[in-house]
Amino acid sequence: MNAQLKQLWTKTLNIIKGELTEVSFNTWIKSISPISMNENTIKLEVPNDFTRGILESRYKDLIINAIKLITSKKYNIEFSITSEEIFNNQQLKPKSSNDNIVVNDEMTSILNPKYTFDSFVIGNSNRFAHAASLAVAESPAKAYNPLFIYGGVGLGKTHLMHAIGHYILQNTPNAKVVYVSSEKFTNELINSIKDDKNEEFRNKYRNVDVLLIDDIQFIAGKERTQEEFFHTFNALYEADKQIILSSDRPPKEIPTLEDRLRSRFEWGLIADIQAPDFETRIAILKKKADVENLDIPNEVMVYIATKIKSNIRELEGALIRIVAYSSLTNREISVDLAAEALKDIISSEQNKQITIELIQDIVCNYFNLKIQELKSSRRTRNIAFPRQIAMYLSRKLTDMSLPKIGEEFGGRDHTTVIHAYEKISNILKKDESLRNVIDDLNKKITNN
């Protein structure tokens, strides 16, 4: 940026600042960087496509008029997206099997620069998974191999996988680190078969130091993909190369996954991530506000954390939605404004808040039992069968892991939960009276 443009932009900001609320200015204008200027046009760089759209529709004329006040000339304004954002967007586009980013002439993955260990918020719900990921990053193929991370959508699995990749590349720049989704792995395999490039495909995934595969559950039911990944896994494992996998469920719960793969996924360490607790949700919101340079009142963060409980993605999305709503309505951020901005999300979120405790209460009332009896070690049919029904419903209606469900039923093992789920599922196939009971309980739980 030349001195003339820098001086002009500083004066322009001073004019615009007097026309907007502080929130609108900080959200939309402050992030703009002037990059070039010629006789008729000034080019401005913005952080993302969403911001560009808002600036084009709402603030472009304001910027043009502010510059005209200073220069007495009407310049054309062009917005472009920062090179980092373009790079990130390219990561999301499908690529051919030969379309790789090369660092030091070695094949590597494309990792999101925002997903590092430093930007990961640690809480009780993810502390173990974070520690395991860091251990693997510090000592690839020596600490835990494979590392299997599982948890619900938007809880930070992908963040940890990218963080592992970043850490390894920072400390060993020449390492071959490949990150890929299981869907892309499958698509590349199909293309390699179609184009008769099987050997090229195998070389790509078997000659690496670290392989990170996201959403591995999607290879279930795909026989050829499972066959290929089985041999890829073996080749890497035998060569002492690190394998990191993520899934929305533990290996035991992935349906139609071959037993030989299931057993290999369990060779190393399995770490789960749960939904963040209240304190962690507050910490996540504060971190997001700091990163985005947002001034959010503490009581608004408490409101968001109280209402949005399911995952990190929805938490951060709620924060951005409130800021955008404040800017578009020209109002200061407050709890009342937050309630307006999030009314649709909160309604949906509240509908999803089915807990194991709620299921236990309703099942106990239905069968005239006490909670202590449901959690006890007693195995009489009048207690054991309702307990199995409650476990079945907990598995169907919540995102809790099998170990967590077992823990809520008197500290039982996850295999007990599996047995209960399978038993009730089998009876439901032939027993209409039980189907009616389950339907009735379902209605009571979801309408509660």
Swiss-Prot record:
Keywords: ATP-binding, Cytoplasm, DNA replication, DNA-binding, Lipid-binding, Nucleotide-binding. Residues 110-326 are annotated as: Domain III, AAA+ region. InterPro entries: AAA+_ATPase, Chromosome_initiator_DnaA, Chromosome_initiator_DnaA-like, Chromosome_initiator_DnaA_CS, DnaA_C, DnaA_dom, DnaA_N_dom, DnaA_N_sf. Residues 73-109 are annotated as: Domain II. GO terms for cellular component: cytoplasm; plasma membrane. It comes from the Bacteria. One of its GO terms (biological process) is DNA replication initiation. ATP binds at G154, G156, K157, T158. Residues 1-73 are annotated as: Domain I, interacts with DnaA modulators. Residues 327-448 are annotated as: Domain IV, binds dsDNA. Transmembrane segments: none annotated. It is found in: Cytoplasm. One of its GO terms (molecular function) is DNA replication origin binding. Its main location: cytoplasm. Oligomerizes as a right-handed, spiral filament on DNA at oriC. NCBIfam families: DnaA (TIGR00362), PRK14086.1 (NF010686). PANTHER family: CHROMOSOMAL REPLICATION INITIATOR PROTEIN DNAA. Domain I is involved in oligomerization and binding regulators, domain II is flexibile and of varying length in different bacteria, domain III forms the AAA+ region, while domain IV binds dsDNA. Plays an essential role in the initiation and regulation of chromosomal replication. ATP-DnaA binds to the origin of replication (oriC) to initiate formation of the DNA replication initiation complex once per cell cycle. Binds the DnaA box (a 9 base pair repeat at the origin) and separates the double-stranded (ds)DNA. Forms a right-handed helical filament on oriC DNA; dsDNA binds to the exterior of the filament while single-stranded (ss)DNA is stabiized in the filament's interior. Belongs to the DnaA family. This is Chromosomal replication initiator protein DnaA. It comes from Clostridium novyi (strain NT). The lineage of its organism: Bacteria, Bacillati, Bacillota, Clostridia, Eubacteriales. The gene is dnaA.
